[in-house]
Amino acid sequence: MEKPDSVKKLCEASLRVDTSLLKMLADADIRGRICEDKNGLLEAVELFEIFCREQDCWSKPREFATDCARFHYFHAEDSYIDYIPHEQFKCEVTMLSGLPGMGKDYYIQSAGMDMPVVSLDAIRRKYKLSPTDKSANGRVVQMAKEEARTYLRKGQDFVWNATNITRQMRAQLIDLFVDYGAKVKIVYLEQPYHTWRQQNKSREYALPESVLDKMLDKLEVPQLTEAHEVVYHVV
């Protein structure tokens, strides 16, 4: 509560967890401790509940007037929490997010997405570059960004088809898309573990198990604060 941007951090937390359960956990943790400042810590927990109630996120997610208002609040400096920005997007970018073998290509086909697709895998195959060749990753991403810019300049909706498994990776792309006036929708895809592994083995360009393990360790599931819209397609 005493940290910078405490309101913003609290509201973000409320979109991820039930704040009343968070307080319950903290209270139980403190009562189980043997320490001199137990009363002070218990008082801080009670103040946390008051703070949540003041910000209208006690036992519920903080609500925003629109998805765009939520995105603006978490991405703009010193933004007013109840500000409702004017929505005038030039195009919409659908960013897929998911580990290799989770069915991103199948999702594009089954969803009937009649728009261009910027695919990092397609670029790698075109230039015969291995997905495990880290030295080529930068080149592939730059080519994909240039392709994306052609659609952004024209105001053309498109799909960005890549793993996008870390928040930092997504943020860099979202900043680019938003600079061109695009609305960004993240679609996160996840299959059961054994289904995922089997689907990878069945792919024409299957990845080694060791590579999948490393990517799984790095996975950061997209949060509602990251884009104008976040969809969880979890089977």
Residue spans of the language-model regions?
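Glycine-rich phosphate-binding P-loop
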Residues: 92-112
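Conserved GTP-binding G-domain of TRAFAC-class P-loop NTPases and closely related GTPase folds
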Residues: 94, 114, 193-235
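Conserved substrate/cofactor phosphate-moiety recognition/catalytic segment
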Residues: 105-158, 193-197
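Short catalytic-loop micro-motif centered on adjacent basic/acidic residues
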Residues: 158-162, 186
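Acidic, metal-coordinating catalytic cores used for nucleic-acid/nucleotide bond scission
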Residues: 161-170
